[in-house]
């Protein structure tokens, strides 16, 4: 009998030891994204601590809103609205003065300030905006975009968008659903405003030996732009907002050949009315502006896209690569207005977004 109790005691001890020992934690396998990566523009995410004064649960018109405490995996689909000049000068939830030309947005429950990638579901255009205000409070609306952001996404009253949160770590690293398949163009300048077509015509772009002195060249981050190869046409990049553009009719920007004033003496380079196939001078490439249309992770697709754009718009172009990212650029142009004119044509005729950068 004692032996039986002894065995029962031993079994109990062993059983309790098994129960008290916590199970070994299962290591979660992080799924990596292996699809295409596209570069998009917009507000450049920077680390900003959440403002505790504007991140408390609140109530508006009898409706309670609970602030999302952990938005690391936040995504949302719904209708977007926009606000512009009618709200200029108003104070946002962060205490900033609202500027309709800034790439900002209002969201009812996301932490402030934060950054999100907004995608127009109907046309695929994407942009990064900074959330610095509360709203909208209209049923069915999930985000309120500034006029500048809405214009670049081509938002209407019935446009459905997808919101993906971008987490910015203190060291500046980016993660979250807003970074899946995306790289963000680093830029230290404001995106160009829409050109005034009534002020000047869209003339043929001219490549001069050197850009005009005193031209207002806005500061940019040139570390991501490689030297311009004049022997290849430069495709205008729309920062990957759209897929390959549709054919466009021949327009005003037919060539980028240099203009010869009167009677040149040394004529190795002859200006012809057709598209330029000769190599521009190194001084023309080393200054001026290019229009960046998009960035792809496939070199062959980027080259094909660039050649198609160069042929249809009658401008030179090239594909500039940085690591595994291939940027499609058009130009260079000696005057910024020429780049603005081409940018407007890309938007109107090909529904293609783009931005202007200084040529290396």
From Swiss-Prot:
A lipid is attached at residue 18 (N-palmitoyl cysteine). It is an enzyme of class 4 (lyase). Transmembrane segments: none annotated. It is found in: Cell membrane. One of its GO terms (cellular component) is plasma membrane. Its main location: membrane. CDD domains: DPBB_RlpA-like. GO terms for molecular function: lytic endotransglycosylase activity; peptidoglycan binding. HAMAP family: RlpA. This is Endolytic peptidoglycan transglycosylase RlpA. The lineage of its organism: Bacteria, Pseudomonadati, Pseudomonadota, Gammaproteobacteria, Enterobacterales.
């Amino acid at each position: 009998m004692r032996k039986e109790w002894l065995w029962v005691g031993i079994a109990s001890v062993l059983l309790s030891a098994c129960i008290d020992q916590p199970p070994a934690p299962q290591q979660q396998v992080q799924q990596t994204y292996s699809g295409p990566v596209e570069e998009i523009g917009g507000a450049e995410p920077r680390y900003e601590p959440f403002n505790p004064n504007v991140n408390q649960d609140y109530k508006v018109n009898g409706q309670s809103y609970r602030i999302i405490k952990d938005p690391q995996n936040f995504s949302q689909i719904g209708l977007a609205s926009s606000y512009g000049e009618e709200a200029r000068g108003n104070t946002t939830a962060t205490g900033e003065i609202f500027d309709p030309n800034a790439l900002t947005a209002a969201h009812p429950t996301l932490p402030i300030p934060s950054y999100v990638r907004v995608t127009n579901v109907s046309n695929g255009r994407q942009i990064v905006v900074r959330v610095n205000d509360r709203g909208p409070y209209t049923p069915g609306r999930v985000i309120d975009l500034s006029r500048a952001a809405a214009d670049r996404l081509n938002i209407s009253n019935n446009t459905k968008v997808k919101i993906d949160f971008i987490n910015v770590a203190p060291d500046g690293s980016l993660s979250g659903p807003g970074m899946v398949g995306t790289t963000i163009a680093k830029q230290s300048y404001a995106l160009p405003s829409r050109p005034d077509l009534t002020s000047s015509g869209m003339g043929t772009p001219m490549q001069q030996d050197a850009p005009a002195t005193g031209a207002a060249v806005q500061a940019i981050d040139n570390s991501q732009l490689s030297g311009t190869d004049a022997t290849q046409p430069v495709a205008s990049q729309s920062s990957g907002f759209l897929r390959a553009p549709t054919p466009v009719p021949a327009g005003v920007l037919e060539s980028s050949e240099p203009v010869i004033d009167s009677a040149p003496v040394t004529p190795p380079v002859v200006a012809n009315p057709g598209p330029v196939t000769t190599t521009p001078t190194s001084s023309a490439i080393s200054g001026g502006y290019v229009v960046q249309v998009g960035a792809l992770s496939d070199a062959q697709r980027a080259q094909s896209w660039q050649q198609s754009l160069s042929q249809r718009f009658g401008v030179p172009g090239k594909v500039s690569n940085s690591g595994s990212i291939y940027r499609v650029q058009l130009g260079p142009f000696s005057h910024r207005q020429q780049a603005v004119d081409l940018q407007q044509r890309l938007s109107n005729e090909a529904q293609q977004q783009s931005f202007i950068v200084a040529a290396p």
